[in-house]
Amino acid sequence: MKYNRELLFGRWFREDIDDQNRKVVEYAQLSADGSFEFTFVTIATQGGNVKTVLEQVTELGDWGLVADIHFTITKNEVVDEQLYTVDLNDSNNYHAYRVLQLNHHTFEYQHIDTNEIFKMRKVTDNIGYC
């Protein structure tokens, strides 16, 4: 299946619970020029409420979409407000995903190697009135 690349432009959001019962929130900005900014926030919770932010990492790099394959190349990371260049020889900075669903509201994709499935929701700046 072939997906329209323009559908990915903009801001996306997802949250999950990891295997250590921590909340992981991802904010993604995918730009038309092929650049991305992903921010991952790991949060300790207690009784469903935020207890403390454990980690916040921002990744910067390039992305693309060919047919039903979405790929990312991380080039920089921001940790504790410090910008670091990543090792481009490290295969962990390259990821490919099969797109399962993509429309104006939802982006669902599966990692090619790990088979993990992620589902993001589009963040809209415009609130419609009825």
Which residue ranges define each predicted feature?
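Lipid interaction determinants
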Residues: M1-V66, F71-C130
